[in-house]
């Protein structure tokens, strides 16, 4: 279930303060955040936010198409190592 519409979108307070401060000064700095649950709002468009994925911060450039999504959607937390090679499996079984 989604969040109640009367509550509005969740955005981390400190992240929102940093975005507003950068908008006032007109600077374009990378903002580090651990708040993957924060929703992307129109004020964030044009900024680069480094979202933590559990191992490192992944830089995400915010565009208009991303509005309404969560920051965590753009920083995957799992690595896919790939499936085992079929030839390698057959060789192991014969030995």
UniProtKB/Swiss-Prot annotation:
Superkingdom: Bacteria
Any one GO cellular component localisation term in the record: cytoplasm
Alphabetized Pfam families for the sequence: Ribosomal_S19
Coiled-coil stretches noted in the UniProt entry, renumbered to this chain: none
SUPFAM superfamilies in the record: Ribosomal protein S19 (SSF54570)
Residues of the signal peptide: none
Keywords, comma-separated and alphabetical: Ribonucleoprotein, Ribosomal protein, RNA-binding, rRNA-binding
PANTHER family: RIBOSOMAL PROTEIN S19P FAMILY MEMBER (PTHR11880), SMALL RIBOSOMAL SUBUNIT PROTEIN US19M (PTHR11880:SF8)
Protein's name according to its UniProt entry: Small ribosomal subunit protein uS19
């Amino acid at each position: 279930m989604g969040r109640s519409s009367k509550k509005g979108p969740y955005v981390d307070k400190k992240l929102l303060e940093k975005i507003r401060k950068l908008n006032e000064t007109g600077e374009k700095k990378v903002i580090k955040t651990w708040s993957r649950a924060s929703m992307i709002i129109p004020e964030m468009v044009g900024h680069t936010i480094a979202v933590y994925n559990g191992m490192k911060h992944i830089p995400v450039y915010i565009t208009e198409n991303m509005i309404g999504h969560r920051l965590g959607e753009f920083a995957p937390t799992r690595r896919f190592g790939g499936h085992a090679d079929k030839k390698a499996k057959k060789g192991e079984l014969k030995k």
